[in-house]
From Swiss-Prot:
InterPro entries in UniProt: APOC4 (IPR028120)
Presence of the UniProt keyword Secreted in the record: yes
Summary of the tissues where the protein is detected: Expressed by the liver and secreted in plasma.
Superkingdom of the source species: Eukaryota
GO biological process: lipid storage; lipid transport; triglyceride homeostasis
Name this protein carries in UniProt: Apolipoprotein C-IV
Family: Belongs to the apolipoprotein C4 family.
Glycosylation sites: N107
UniProt KW Secreted keyword: yes
Record function comment: May participate in lipoprotein metabolism.
GO cellular component: extracellular region; high-density lipoprotein particle; very-low-density lipoprotein particle
Protein's cellular compartments: Secreted
Record key words, sorted: Glycoprotein, Lipid transport, Secreted, Signal, Transport
């Protein structure tokens, strides 16, 4: 199936799969990509050698193009933006949520309490 003909909803999963495959292959050393010496007459060794001959330049080009992505600058920028957008005011937001939850729970408990057990303080 061609990537150009796949449905738009399938593109994220295909892209993620390709990214995973590229990162996996890029993490392998170039020694592991070179064919191991074996019987030259075997058809499978010829097929493997041909596939590696086609894939190795692609992996090298992809690794070189995506080098900026794996560098510390890209990750640091992402983490800084994420912190500023989501975590910077987490403490005050958490305190406000705990306070409102406590008040809501006390009000609900007070409304469920029988009048004989929980007399209003204004009645004496």
């Amino acid at each position: 199936m061609s990537l150009l003909r796949c449905r738009p909803r399938d593109l994220p999963s295909v892209s993620l799969s390709v990214l995973f495959l590229v990162s996996f292959v890029a993490s392998m050393s170039t020694e592991s990509l070179s064919p191991t010496p074996g019987p030259e007459s075997s058809r499978w060794s010829l097929v493997r050698a041909r596939v590696l001959e086609m894939v190795e330049p692609l992996v090298t080009r992809t690794r070189d193009r995506w080098q900026w992505f794996w560098g510390p600058g890209a990750v640091q920028g992402f983490m800084q933006t994420y912190y500023e957008d989501h975590l910077k005011d987490l403490g005050p937001r958490t305190q406000a949520w705990l306070q409102s939850s406590r008040d809501h729970l006390l009000n609900k408990t007070h409304s469920l309490c029988p009048r004989l057990l929980c007399k209003d303080r204004t009645q004496g």
